[in-house]
UniProtKB/Swiss-Prot annotation:
Protein name, entry field: Monooxygenase AgnL5
InterPro entries, per database record: Fungal_Meroterpenoid_Isomerase, NTF2-like_dom_sf
Biological or metabolic pathway of the protein: Secondary metabolite biosynthesis
Native species: Paecilomyces divaricatus (Penicillium divaricatum)
Name of the gene: AgnL5
Protein's UniProt keywords contain Oxidoreductase: yes
Length: 161
């Protein structure tokens, strides 16, 4: 039996607000302990991430993308299936160029409906294929995800070209 629609709706609003604020901790606070992130399309070969893995990468991503702006185009909430879908566009600035990403997220709520249990993200694969390696190089050049998230690194932000 799905969680009450109003509980799911409140969780969805908290998720969207954290995303809009580009606040990693607020986002993480809404994830279930057994949370899983799945990057789509699966043909990209990106393995799913546990909550612990997302806790390492998300703060670094948020710290790396500056002047982040999110435009939410469509939200569909299906309380009977304990799910929601969001289509969004985002822009920002990376140390090596612009961040312009179009994506859809598919949310599965926890059994109680008060947390996000699964987040499937369908991202612009052309952007992601370029961004992924550069982000990895940037993290490595600047002391890893924790150092980037904390704003410290090898003498400040090192751009990747």
């Amino acid at each position: 039996m799905p969680a009450p629609a109003e509980v799911q709706a409140a969780t969805l609003q908290r998720f969207l607000a954290a995303w809009q604020k580009w606040d990693a901790q607020e986002w993480l606070d809404g994830f279930a302990d057994d949370f899983t992130q799945i990057t789509l399309p699966l043909s990209l070969g990106i393995p799913s991430r546990s909550r612990a893995e997302v806790e390492q990468v998300l703060p670094a991503l948020v710290a790396t993308v500056k002047s982040y702006q999110l435009t939410i185009r469509t939200v569909v909430h299906d309380p009977e299936r304990n799910k929601a879908a969001v289509y969004a566009l985002s822009t920002g600035t990376l140390p090596w160029g612009p961040w312009e990403l179009e994506y859809s997220v598919f949310i599965t709520f926890s059994e109680a409906g008060d947390q996000v249990a699964v987040l499937e993200e369908m991202m612009d694969s052309a952007f992601l294929q370029e961004f992924g390696p550069k982000f990895g190089q940037y993290l490595q050049a600047n002391g890893g995800p924790r150092a980037v998230a904390a704003g410290v690194g090898a003498g400040g932000a090192t751009a990747v070209h």
